[in-house]
């Protein structure tokens, strides 16, 4: 059975106000968050933004230190100002189309498709533990907004988290808030 939670009704054809919200699929082993955005850059530029250490600093929630962007390569993700470091492994890398890697307990996937006008359709998924799905959806919404060059209010995370919590708890149970020390 595949259940999906849609916190804004974006799958309702009448709602076109915010196509950047996450959808949640619960039909597999783990919940999967899915975001889809059209970015105003060609795939090669988006690929650099998701693989270049300096460009990642502009939008990713922590440092990203990769041995290489090829299957099997190791990645570390130190969080500035904390003693927390996640580790990961590159699962798939086909420049400039697909990048997938583990991020701690999660699997992140970026799928890039060229769009007319030199733009790129990004489909981002996060295979996440169920109890942090709302937290992750709120965080990725902000991070992907930064990747798209959007101006994000400093207090936006809380509103996103509250909305996703209300949408996801019926399917996934209680949701954890921000990590300790955040």
Q: What residue spans do the PLM features occupy?
A:
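Hydrophobic-ligand binding "helix-grip"
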Residues: 65-71, 76-131
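Short beta-edge strand/loop motif at the mouth of beta-sheet-based domains
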Residues: 34-35, 41, 45, 51-87, ...
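Terminal "cap-and-tail" regions of soluble proteins that handle hydrophobic small molecules
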Residues: 2-26, 118-121, 126-182
């Amino acid at each position: 059975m595949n259940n999906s939670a849609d916190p804004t009704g974006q799958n309702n054809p009448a709602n076109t106000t915010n196509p950047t919200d996450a959808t949640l699929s619960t039909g597999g082993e783990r919940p999967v968050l899915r975001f889809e955005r059209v970015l105003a850059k060609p795939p090669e530029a988006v690929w650099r933004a998701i693989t270049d250490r300096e460009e990642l600093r502009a939008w990713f929630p922590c440092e990203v230190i990769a041995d290489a962007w090829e299957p099997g390569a190791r990645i570390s993700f130190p969080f500035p100002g904390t003693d927390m470091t996640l580790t990961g492994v590159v699962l798939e890398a086909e420049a400039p189309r697909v990048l997938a890697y583990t991020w701690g307990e999660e699997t992140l996937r970026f799928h890039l498709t060229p769009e007319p006008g030199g733009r790129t359709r990004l489909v981002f998924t996060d295979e996440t533990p169920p109890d942090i799905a709302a937290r992750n959806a709120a965080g990725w919404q902000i991070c992907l907004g930064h990747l798209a060059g959007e101006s994000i209010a400093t207090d936006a995370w809380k509103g996103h988290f509250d909305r996703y919590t209300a949408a996801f708890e019926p399917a996934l149970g209680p949701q954890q808030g921000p990590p300790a020390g955040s």
